[in-house]
């Protein structure tokens, strides 16, 4: 399955000057919501991701996503895996588990995002779940921006990666684009970064 073509066909691979939720600036932005607005494609992508996870023979009892960007991807992945789905969300800028969602002690959970850049949001979600006694067994995403190490990828983890190295990250594709710290972004010389993404927007 050509994941890059899926993003291009859905007009979800945007070019410009963007402020990513990780804080980095980039000339490309992946808008997964445009890909996931097609239920059949969302189901197909989730099944592809679930296949990778099932081949790893992991015991997963639940999928959890940080709102809002990860919700559609996480729900479809949970459906493909046949497990329940919950999500965390920010309240006053603090990641929280609410809406009656509960986790059991030692419940084995996969944290799923639509896109993994540094993994910061996924780790905020992880912290909430672990504080409630859950056991995080893996991470998943439709796409990986190449900072974190993905299972089945030759790319190594880069500076800024937040995900723990001892847990697998399953994703369908690496999208490696230039990313810049705000204080050294060459794009800022000619334009202002816009934020089309999820965190704080």
From Swiss-Prot:
<keyword id="KW-0808">Transferase</keyword>
<comment type="subunit">
    <text>Homodimer.</text>
</comment>
<dbReference type="GO" id="GO:0044205">
    <property type="term" value="P:'de novo' UMP biosynthetic process"/>
</dbReference>
<comment type="pathway">
    <text>Pyrimidine metabolism; UMP biosynthesis via de novo pathway; UMP from orotate: step 1/2.</text>
</comment>
<comment type="function">
    <text>Catalyzes the transfer of a ribosyl phosphate group from 5-phosphoribose 1-diphosphate to orotate, leading to the formation of orotidine monophosphate (OMP).</text>
</comment>
<dbReference type="GO" id="GO:0000287">
    <property type="term" value="F:magnesium ion binding"/>
</dbReference>
<comment type="similarity">
    <text>Belongs to the purine/pyrimidine phosphoribosyltransferase family. PyrE subfamily.</text>
</comment>
<protein>
    <recommendedName>
        <fullName>Orotate phosphoribosyltransferase</fullName>
        <ecNumber>2.4.2.10</ecNumber>
    </recommendedName>
</protein>
<dbReference type="GO" id="GO:0019856">
    <property type="term" value="P:pyrimidine nucleobase biosynthetic process"/>
</dbReference>
<dbReference type="InterPro" id="IPR000836">
    <property type="entry name" value="PRibTrfase_dom"/>
</dbReference>
<dbReference type="GO" id="GO:0004588">
    <property type="term" value="F:orotate phosphoribosyltransferase activity"/>
</dbReference>
<dbReference type="InterPro" id="IPR023031">
    <property type="entry name" value="OPRT"/>
</dbReference>
<feature type="binding site">
    <location>
        <position position="117"/>
    </location>
    <ligand>
        <name>orotate</name>
    </ligand>
</feature>
<keyword id="KW-0665">Pyrimidine biosynthesis</keyword>
<feature type="binding site">
    <location>
        <begin position="113"/>
        <end position="121"/>
    </location>
    <ligand>
        <name>5-phospho-alpha-D-ribose 1-diphosphate</name>
    </ligand>
</feature>
<dbReference type="InterPro" id="IPR006273">
    <property type="entry name" value="Orotate_PRibTrfase_bac"/>
</dbReference>
<dbReference type="InterPro" id="IPR029057">
    <property type="entry name" value="PRTase-like"/>
</dbReference>
<keyword id="KW-0328">Glycosyltransferase</keyword>
<feature type="binding site">
    <location>
        <position position="145"/>
    </location>
    <ligand>
        <name>orotate</name>
    </ligand>
</feature>
<keyword id="KW-0460">Magnesium</keyword>
<dbReference type="Pfam" id="PF00156">
    <property type="entry name" value="Pribosyltran"/>
</dbReference>
